C-alpha cells in the first residue's frame, strides 16, 4: 500500500473506533439515567412504563404501615398521591409529613415498588453527632448567623 492509502485506512479506523466508543458510552449513560417525577406527573401517566424512575414528594400523614421489613406508605405532592411499597430498612430521617425520594418502578397495580428510599431534609439539617459536638463544645454565634465550634484544649 502507498503511504496515502495507509493514512486513509488509519484515519477511517480511528473514526470507527471513536464512533463505537461514543455509542457504548451513550448507551451506558442512557441505561443509568433515572428521571424524577412528582405524584401528579405519575398519575397523569408521564412517567415511563417498565423503567425505573424517582418518585418524590411528602410522606402522607397516617399512611405508613410496617409489616416486618415491608413498609407501605403514600407519597403526595398535595395534588395527587401514589402508594409505595418498599422492602428494606428506611433511613432515620424518614417520617410522615417529611420529604422523600423513592427510586423504583410503577407496578401494574398502580403501586410504586421502590428499590431505594431517600429521606429529604432541609438546608438546616445537621447530623446528630455534629449537634452533640456543638452542644458540648459551645454555643452558636448568633451575630453571624452560622454555627461555630469552639476548640477547647486541656
Curated annotation (Swiss-Prot):
Membrane-crossing residue ranges in chain numbering: 8-28
| Residues noted as binding heme in the record, renumbered to the chain | 121, 125
Annotated spans, Disordered: 131-154
Membrane topology, from the record: Single-pass type II membrane protein
Q: Which UniProt keywords apply?
A: Cell inner membrane, Cell membrane, Cytochrome c-type biogenesis, Heme, Iron, Membrane, Metal-binding, Signal-anchor, Transmembrane, Transmembrane helix
- Which molecular-function annotations from GO does this UniProt entry contain? heme binding; metal ion binding
Q: Can the keyword Heme be found in this entry's annotation? A: yes
**InterPro entries attached to this UniProt entry:** CcmE, CcmE-like_sf, NA-bd_OB-fold
GO biological process, any:
cytochrome complex assembly
Membrane topology, Cytoplasmic segments: 1-7
Can you quote a single GO CC term?
Answer: plasma membrane
The entry's function note states:
Heme chaperone required for the biogenesis of c-type cytochromes. Transiently binds heme delivered by CcmC and transfers the heme to apo-cytochromes in a process facilitated by CcmF and CcmH.
| Family stated for the protein in its record | Belongs to the CcmE/CycJ family.
Put simply, this protein is called: Cytochrome c-type biogenesis protein CcmE
Species of origin: Methylibium petroleiphilum (strain ATCC BAA-1232 / LMG 22953 / PM1)
Q: What is the lineage of its organism?
A: Bacteria, Pseudomonadati, Pseudomonadota, Betaproteobacteria, Burkholderiales
Name the gene that codes for it.
Answer: ccmE
